[in-house]
A protein has these predicted regions:
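Bacterial Sec-dependent N-terminal signal peptides
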Residues: 1-31
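Extracytoplasmic cysteine-anchoring/structural motifs
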Residues: 20-330
Length: 330
């Protein structure tokens, strides 16, 4: 009986040690990882009107191990590497990351209603198509769904509570008709427009090269489509441009939207632009604008009496932001 008691005591001690060892091991492993939560938001947080990120509803992200040659990691938690719904231009992402390690994070936000963009996550490349991939034909003009945003964060140390602001890799090109010109049309209005210009089809998302476009510009044709405010009678979808008044102050000035399109450009570009506009009486108006400046994450606005005085127009480039994040990546 005494011998049995001794064996039982030793067994209990051994089991207790094993339990403690398992607990310590689990605690040690837990300390090696951080359950990181960070927020992704869009830089364009203004009113939800045309040209204001109204259709962005998905964000994809890639996580790369810097110490392991930038290797793309497999999904790290219950959330898969893929699309997460946006809510009020924000998305919250939860991932488990190793404590003390550096990561590169790549985010790309887009509209689920467009197939204009694809990301090669292994090679960290953004590919842009100006065709309708379903039909193989040129895409339509004035599609808000072609809007997109990105951000690359290098050498991120696992932490929580971080907010990343995404900016457009695109320039927004607009044409706006003055209200006096609109009045001169005596009730007629422009209902459709098309665009012919040049833009790039690929951009790097790579380490130290992100934001660099690749290759040469390609010809881009966006086919005739409804203008963004064709059914608007209250001015809600006006093109609002900051124009200098007589004292040199920038004043918000409304124009009738005739054209709005997104183009992948280098940090700054000069392109030739042709806009064809269809009036509701069936008349076509074609306007050519040479050497128009485009700038990534900015709005280039061609404004004036574009119908009655085709050779009298103004080019105004406004920052695309409505908040304090007034810096485009590269």
């Amino acid at each position: 009986m005494r011998k049995f008691t001794t064996i039982l005591a030793v067994l209990c001690v051994a089991l207790g040690f094993a339990c403690c060892s398992t607990s310590d091991s689990e605690e040690s492993v837990a300390k090696q990882y951080i359950d990181a939560t960070f927020t992704v938001e869009l830089s364009d947080l203004g009113t939800r009107s045309a040209g204001k990120a109204t259709m962005i509803d998905k964000v994809e992200y890639g996580i790369y191990d810097v110490a392991d040659g930038g290797r793309l990691l497999a999904p790290i938690s219950s959330k898969e590497l893929g699309a997460i719904d946006f809510d009020e231009s924000k998305a919250v992402i939860d991932v488990r990351l190793a404590a003390g390690k550096k990561y590169d994070l790549v985010f790309f936000a887009y509209s689920s209603k467009s197939n204009a963009y694809s990301v090669d996550w292994e090679n960290r490349l953004l590919n842009v198509s100006y065709k309708n991939t379903a039909t193989g034909k040129n895409d339509l003009a004035n599609l808000e769904s072609r809007d997109a945003f990105f951000h690359v964060e290098q050498d991120f140390l696992a932490s929580t509570g971080k907010t990343f602001v995404l900016n457009r890799p695109l320039a927004q090109l607009n044409a706006g008709q003055s209200y006096s010109d609109f009045a001169n049309m005596l009730g007629n209005k422009i209902i459709k427009s098309s665009l012919t210009t040049q833009a790039y089809t690929q951009m790097s998302l790579g380490r130290d090269t992100y934001g660099n476009v690749l290759g040469s510009k390609s010809d881009v044709v966006f086919e005739l489509n409804d203008v963004v405010d064709v059914d608007d009678t209250e001015g809600n979808d006006d093109l609002v441009v900051k124009v200098a008044d007589a004292e040199g102050n920038a004043v918000d000035t409304p124009y009738k939207h005739l054209s709005m399109n997104y183009l992948l450009v280098n940090s700054k570009e000069l392109v030739n632009v042709e806009i064809t506009m269809l009036g509701d009486e069936g008349t076509l108006f074609t306007r050519n604008y040479p050497n128009i400046p485009l700038e990534r994450n900015y709005r280039t606005n061609i404004i004036g009496n574009l119908i009655s005085s085709p050779f009298e127009f103004e080019i105004v480039v406004n920052p695309i932001f409505t908040n304090d994040h007034n810096q485009a990546q590269k």
